[in-house]
Amino acid sequence: MELILKYFPNLSDTQREQFAALKALYEDWNSKINVISRKDMDNFYEHHVLHSLAIAHEIRFREGTKVLDLGTGGGFPGIPLAIMFPDSQFKLIDRTGKKIRVVNEVAQAIGLKNVVAEQLSGEEEKAQYDFVVSRAVMPLPDLVKIIKKNVNRKNQHNSLPNGLICLKGGDLQAETKPFKNIVSLTEIHDMFKEESLVMPVCAASYTVRTSAARRGAVCGDEDGGEGRRDGRLRCWRPALRAGSGLSACGRRC
């Protein structure tokens, strides 16, 4: 818990209590249903909670923001984000019913009023949200295809354009190949000085914003863009046309 306060010192008393309660709750549920690797519970706050909160470092969801956590598993990143942003609304979905049971029980136990959890696949979820978040769910091209229908492109009221924010690892060279424009890539290690969190966060255009875990991430749109490579930071920005009124998402918003 001290690790969370190290990077987020301005938590309310309620938020502190909610974060502090998480480990015992997940240890109890993990003894019944394996939702987190049991050998990883000693690093619970670093590997799961703080990792999820890398998204909170990139964007502060404003009041009324609607967020879908696709493939939430045991509730990550959705539960930590819901604690961090009590005035935003979160829907957490997973195709595995026992994991959704854990999510519902944890949310109820810590008094989260802004979380709905349901057993659904990404393909089955039809509603629209300001942002879709995910954590190591599937190859990025597949993820983008699924979530395009779920992103509300009309109501833009956050500091970033509506879209996808995901924590993603693996061989990202192959995953990035179908995409042309990467908006930004940031190392999580630059946010949190913990040895095990050496992973980048990436943002992308096409109303899709992507955060990466461990090696990088992507997204893009069909418009041309200009890019730069700066050490471990790789950024691409949409090519803005004079008088086009384009936002950072690379499209008229």
Regions found by a protein language model. Give the residues of each.
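Conserved SAM/SAH cofactor-binding pocket of Class I
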Residues: 53-137, 144
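N-terminal auxiliary segments of SAM/dcSAM-dependent transferases
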Residues: 1-33
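Conserved beta-strand signature within the Rossmann-like core of class I S-adenosyl-L-methionine
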Residues: 157-171
